[in-house]
């Protein structure tokens, strides 16, 4: 989840949205806000095809992080896992950027996934397929070796927390964090117990096709 201050700024700035979406062909009258959570997401259409513009503030998600995401998604598609695909911009890029008074924003566009959204009233078969899809994703993640872009890990997150605590002189919290880091570092890191997972594999992020059951 992004900072509330970042969310408020991003939602209030049409200039940022206009500056980013102009890099992809679109029908102006179809643009609408889809959501603002860990990213800003704008839904739009072009010639009756549906797309999503996803953008984020540089302090929330670096360009290196986004490049690593796209590399992983390319790996999933190459291994026949159903995953949305990024759309090349009019400039020939997968990632576009725009500078604003508060900093840089990075954007990617994805073609809308096939299938339908599911509500919480799943059938037994759909529950089974949901679990199979997550299991297949984690099996692929277990074998995944980044080619060029390695995503940040838990140590990067905790190091970021440490820098914030030190800045605010939270001595007791710093001691507790140091204990936590030592405990986590003592856990053996194996392919069977450590790797990339999907932390938000919920219905909002899934589309289901009845005929293929994926």
Language-model features: locations:
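Short, P/G- and charge-enriched loop/turn segments at secondary-structure junctions
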Residues: 29-30, 95-99, 184-193
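Conserved NTP-binding catalytic cores of kinases and kinase-like/nucleotidyltransferase enzymes
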Residues: 1-90, 209-212
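ATP-binding pocket architecture of kinase catalytic cores
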Residues: 46-145
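Short Pro/Gly-enriched beta-strand edge/turn motifs at strand-loop
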Residues: 20-28, 178-189
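Contiguous, function-dense segments enriched for cysteine-driven chemistry
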Residues: 158-178, 203-211
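A cross-family kinase active-site recognition segment
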Residues: 120-171, 192-194
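Generic alpha-helical secondary structure signal
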Residues: 105-108, 156, 179
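Active-site acidic catalytic loop and adjacent metal/ATP-binding pocket
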Residues: 37-48, 52, 182-214
């Amino acid at each position: 989840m992004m900072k509330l201050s970042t969310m408020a700024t991003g939602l209030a700035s049409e200039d940022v949205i206009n500056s980013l979406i102009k890099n992809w062909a679109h029908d102006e009258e179809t643009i609408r806000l889809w959501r603002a959570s860990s990213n800003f997401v704008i839904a739009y259409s072009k010639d009756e095809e549906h797309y999503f513009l996803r953008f984020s503030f540089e302090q929330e998600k670096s360009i290196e992080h986004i490049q690593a995401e796209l590399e992983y998604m390319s790996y999933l598609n190459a291994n026949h896992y159903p995953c949305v695909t990024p759309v090349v911009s009019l400039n020939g890029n997968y990632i576009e950027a725009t500078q604003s008074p508060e900093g840089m924003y990075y954007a990617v566009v994805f073609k809308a996934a096939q299938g339908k959204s599911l509500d919480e009233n799943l059938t037994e078969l759909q529950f089974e397929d949901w679990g199979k899809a997550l299991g297949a994703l984690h099996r692929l993640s277990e074998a995944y070796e980044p080619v060029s872009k390695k995503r940040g890990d838990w140590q990067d997150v905790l190091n970021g927390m440490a820098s914030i605590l030190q800045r605010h002189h939270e001595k007791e919290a710093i001691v507790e964090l140091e204990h936590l880091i030592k405990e986590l570092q003592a856990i053996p890191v194996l392919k069977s117990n450590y790797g990339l997972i999907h932390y938000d594999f919920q219905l909002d992020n899934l589309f289901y096709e009845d005929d293929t059951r994926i």
